């Protein structure tokens, strides 16, 4: 008998993209609360859109590539967090036919910072009730007083640079600190010159 030739067409499925980029553990700088994600999402037919949900309830960062071959590799997404707390970052990559892949990073905990020190007389004895003023720019964010041992502690501060000064009637404390926070800063001590 005769043989018949049949043609067979093989179709391959179009797999969804793979969302990727900066290693999850390296996205957020815990000292500055600044997050930076460099995209490295891939797909055989191209990645048309990448979106980043920063986990803080704010706007989602999103970029769309409208030109073939559709690649957003190297695109930089950034966010500066405004408040302490736990954040879960989710990066979503979309291919040219709308298929999506989500990469969810483990929670990142943003903690506030503190500064501390003591106030002493010229003879090195502690001074109680010294007024310590902490400013960020021109705004006073905290005023505290030293305890009986001359010590003070200021907590719950966000990243930034703080101006720290000390005053008490009858004493002169010449030290002025312009202290970056993130991490915390102990040892901001004041010694009277009289």
Model-derived regions, located:
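Extracellular/lumenal mature domains of secreted and surface-exposed proteins
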Residues: 1-112
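Structured interaction patches on ligand/partner-binding surfaces of diverse proteins
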Residues: 2-4, 169-194
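Hydrophobic beta-strand segments
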Residues: 50-52, 130-135, 164
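Short strand-edge motifs at loop-to-beta-strand transitions and within beta-strands
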Residues: 72-79, 150-152, 186-188
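A glycine-anchored, Pro-Gly-centered beta-turn/N-cap motif
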Residues: 85, 158-160
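Structural motif
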Residues: 116-128
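Short, acidic Ser/Thr/Gly-rich low-complexity loop/linker segments typical of extracellular
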Residues: 136-151
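A short, solvent-exposed beta-strand micro-motif common in secreted/extracellular proteins
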Residues: 160-170
């Amino acid at each position: 008998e005769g043989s018949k030739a049949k043609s067979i067409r093989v179709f391959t499925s179009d797999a969804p993209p793979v969302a990727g980029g900066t290693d999850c553990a390296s996205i957020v700088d815990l000292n500055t609360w600044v997050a930076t994600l460099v995209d490295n999402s891939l797909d055989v037919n191209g990645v048309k859109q990448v979106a980043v949900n920063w986990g803080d309830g704010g706007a989602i960062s999103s970029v769309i590539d409208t030109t073939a071959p559709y690649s957003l590799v190297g695109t930089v997404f950034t966010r500066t967090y405004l408040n302490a707390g736990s954040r879960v970052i989710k990066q979503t990559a979309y291919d040219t036919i709308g298929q999506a892949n989500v990469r969810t990073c483990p929670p990142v905990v943003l903690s506030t910072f503190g500064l501390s020190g003591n106030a002493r007389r010229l003879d090195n004895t502690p001074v109680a009730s010294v007024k310590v003023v902490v400013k960020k720019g021109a705004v006073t964010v905290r005023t505290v007083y030293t305890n009986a041992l001359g010590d003070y502690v200021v907590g719950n501060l966000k990243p930034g640079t703080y101006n720290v000064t000390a005053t008490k009637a009858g004493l002169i404390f010449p030290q002025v600190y312009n202290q970056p926070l993130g991490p915390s800063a102990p040892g901001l001590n004041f010694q009277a010159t009289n």
